[in-house]
Regions:
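Beta/alpha (TIM)-barrel catalytic core signal, keyed to glycine-rich beta->alpha loops juxtaposed to Asp/Glu
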Residues: 1-132
Length: 132
């Protein structure tokens, strides 16, 4: 970002990576300082697939959050808190629809203490199976 004058940046703003490794902290600060748009992807990713695990989304190389509305909303709010102006949904219609259905809440309501606690708990469980 110091070499070119970008208007936007596409970056994986994943809550488990952020909580466990501080992933995304530097880019989040930089885009805020420079007034650059931030497109957040991988917000709805839980962890890597486990070997032999059933994969209902065969084109996905990582396990999406599905069936846990509270975690999905908290994960989206985390990405917005990090500075995402736009969230890029996963590639299937169900997840795309989930993001559309919950976008307003993510941009108008802050993460609650309960949501933070849930994200930290889930991040601890995913610690050894992070996507990067």
């Amino acid at each position: 970002l110091s070499m070119f004058d970008f208007d936007t940046v596409l970056f994986p703003l994943n809550w488990a990576l952020g909580i466990n490794r501080g992933w995304g902290d530097r880019i989040s600060e930089t885009v805020k300082e420079k007034g650059i748009g931030l497109l957040g992807m991988k917000a709805l990713v839980r962890r890597n697939w486990r070997e032999g695990e059933a994969r209902p989304y065969p084109k996905s190389w990582c396990q999406p959050i599905w069936g846990d509305e509270a975690l999905g909303v908290a994960a989206m709010k985390y990405a917005v808190l990090k500075g995402a102006h736009t969230l890029v949904p996963p590639g299937n219609f169900e997840h795309f629809s989930f993001m559309l259905d919950h976008a307003d809440a993510c941009y108008t309501k802050a993460l609650t203490d309960e949501e933070w606690a849930m994200l930290r708990r889930e991040a601890k469980e995913a610690e050894k199976e992070l996507i990067f």
